[in-house]
């Protein structure tokens, strides 16, 4: 179920403060965040945000096509390494 249009998109306050601060200075530093639930808004375009995936922070460059999505969508948490090989030698 999607979020109601009557409500504003969720963006963590600390993340919003950091982005507004960088926009006023016109700087492009990497912003480190653990807030995967924050929605990408147009003021974030052009910034690089390092999103936590449970183990490390993955730097993601925000483009205009990402607006409206959540930050966590671009930082995968699981690493699928494939199914186990059929090892007949260990069965004997």
UniProtKB/Swiss-Prot annotation:
GO MF entries: rRNA binding; structural constituent of ribosome
Database matches in Gene3D superfamilies: 30s Ribosomal Protein S19, Chain A (3.30.860.10)
Matching PROSITE patterns: RIBOSOMAL_S19
Source organism, top-level taxon: Eukaryota
Keywords: Chloroplast, Plastid, Ribonucleoprotein, Ribosomal protein, RNA-binding, rRNA-binding
UniProt subcellular location: Plastid, Chloroplast
SUPFAM superfamilies to which the protein is assigned, alphabetical: Ribosomal protein S19 (SSF54570)
Main location group: plastid
Keyword Cytoplasm tagged: no
Pfam families from the UniProt entry: Ribosomal_S19
GO cellular component, one term: chloroplast
Record's keyword annotation contains rRNA-binding: yes
One Gene Ontology term from the biological process aspect of the record: ribosomal small subunit assembly
InterPro entries tied to this protein: Ribosomal_uS19 (IPR002222), Ribosomal_uS19_bac-type (IPR005732), Ribosomal_uS19_CS (IPR020934), Ribosomal_uS19_SF (IPR023575)
PANTHER family: RIBOSOMAL PROTEIN S19P FAMILY MEMBER, SMALL RIBOSOMAL SUBUNIT PROTEIN US19M
Family of this protein: Belongs to the universal ribosomal protein uS19 family.
Function: Protein S19 forms a complex with S13 that binds strongly to the 16S ribosomal RNA.
Protein name, as recorded: Small ribosomal subunit protein uS19c
């Amino acid at each position: 179920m999607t979020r109601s249009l009557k409500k504003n998109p969720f963006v963590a306050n600390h993340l919003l403060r950091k982005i507004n601060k960088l926009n006023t200075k016109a700087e492009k530093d990497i912003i480190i965040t653990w807030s995967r639930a924050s929605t990408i808004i147009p003021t974030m375009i052009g910034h690089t945000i390092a999103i936590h995936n449970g183990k490390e922070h993955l730097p993601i460059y925000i483009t205009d096509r990402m607006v409206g999505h959540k930050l966590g969508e671009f930082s995968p948490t699981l690493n699928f390494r494939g199914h186990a090989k059929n090892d007949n030698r260990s069965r004997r």
